[in-house]
């Protein structure tokens, strides 16, 4: 077991040493829930365009509902073709939901965790600047949230900076 762990650690460390740049990508979330997010990682790892960690915070406020969702994901970016201007990002992770419903002075609260998925199209405009547009989906257990169908879907727009 120690040999397998050592080999895995060695391969991860040697891969990250060969990375060529930092991947940083702020984003805006658009939909019934709105908010922001950020990706941070390294480029050119294990034959991929980038490997990164992603965090986002979205919220919904109304007279009756006050809801927030925080997501924590790991993602990869893969560029296509000879001249890699076009690519795709895929992310998977966890989502944390906190919601409050106020009706006739009574307050009801719900908190849960669920699955978070994301995907985006990437256009690499220059070696240092890329643009992306995608969709995020957070899926929670039935009746654990105030969200219809216990699922949130958001569109996102972001810029990718590599340095």
Regions found by a protein language model. Give the residues of each.
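Cleavable N-terminal export/targeting peptides
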Residues: 1-23
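Short glycine/proline- and aromatic-enriched beta-strand/turn motifs that initiate or cap beta-hairpins
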Residues: 17-65, 69-72, 87, 158-162
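Residues on the lipid-exposed face of transmembrane beta-strands in outer-membrane beta-barrel proteins
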Residues: 28, 38-44, 74-78, 92-94, ...
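Sequence/structural signature of outer-membrane beta-barrel proteins
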Residues: 31-35, 56-64, 95-103, 137-144
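Outer-membrane beta-barrel channels and translocator barrels
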Residues: 43-49, 81-85, 124-128
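Mid-chain, structured segments of secreted extracytoplasmic proteins
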Residues: 61-103
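Predominantly the C-terminal beta-signal and adjacent terminal strand-loop region
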Residues: 124-163
């Amino acid at each position: 077991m120690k040999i397998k762990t050592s080999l895995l650690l060695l391969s991860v460390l040697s891969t990250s040493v060969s990375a060529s740049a930092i991947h940083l990508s702020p984003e805006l979330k658009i939909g019934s829930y709105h908010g922001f997010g950020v990706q941070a990682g390294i480029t050119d790892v294990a034959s991929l365009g980038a490997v990164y960690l992603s965090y986002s915070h979205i919220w919904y406020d109304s007279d009756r509902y006050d809801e927030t969702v925080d997501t924590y994901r790991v993602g990869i970016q893969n560029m296509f073709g000879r001249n890699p201007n076009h690519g795709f990002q895929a992310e998977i992770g966890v989502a944390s939901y906190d919601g409050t419903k106020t009706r006739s002075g009574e307050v009801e609260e719900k908190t849960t965790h669920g699955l978070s998925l994301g995907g985006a199209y990437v256009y690499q405009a220059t070696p240092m600047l890329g643009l992306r547009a995608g969709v995020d989906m957070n899926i929670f257990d039935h009746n654990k949230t105030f969200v219809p169908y216990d699922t949130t879907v958001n569109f996102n727009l972001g810029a990718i900076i590599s340095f």
